[in-house]
Amino acid sequence: VSDMHSILERVDGVLFTGGPDLHPGLYGEDVMDCCGEIAEERDALEIPLMQEAIRMNKPVLAVCRGFQIMNVALGGSLYQDIGKQHKSSVQISHSQEEKDAVHPAHKVNVIRDTPLHQSARVCCKSE
């Protein structure tokens, strides 16, 4: 964590991106058959990184898996497969086909005058 602290002191914020499922053991469950691909090494890095970023009050942008990291890092739990474990009349599927990994998976609307909007303006030189 001390290395993470020194790294986080040098950055303005942290982006937690999408990716594989978190290991269910992180939120007190055994792996079920419906659980997707797991990235334990990434979990081991991102959970303490999220906790330290929050502790240091660093801005965090979480996308897809990033929201799951935030939730679990703060003590929350997850469905291993929400479509199979939570019955709903609405189809819930948050995955992207490997063959389509170059196209956006999610539409993003950035609200004007938010920190993300300011960052996007600096990064992309547009409003």
Go through the PLM ranges and name each one.
Residues 74-127:
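Pocket-forming structural segment of enzyme catalytic cores
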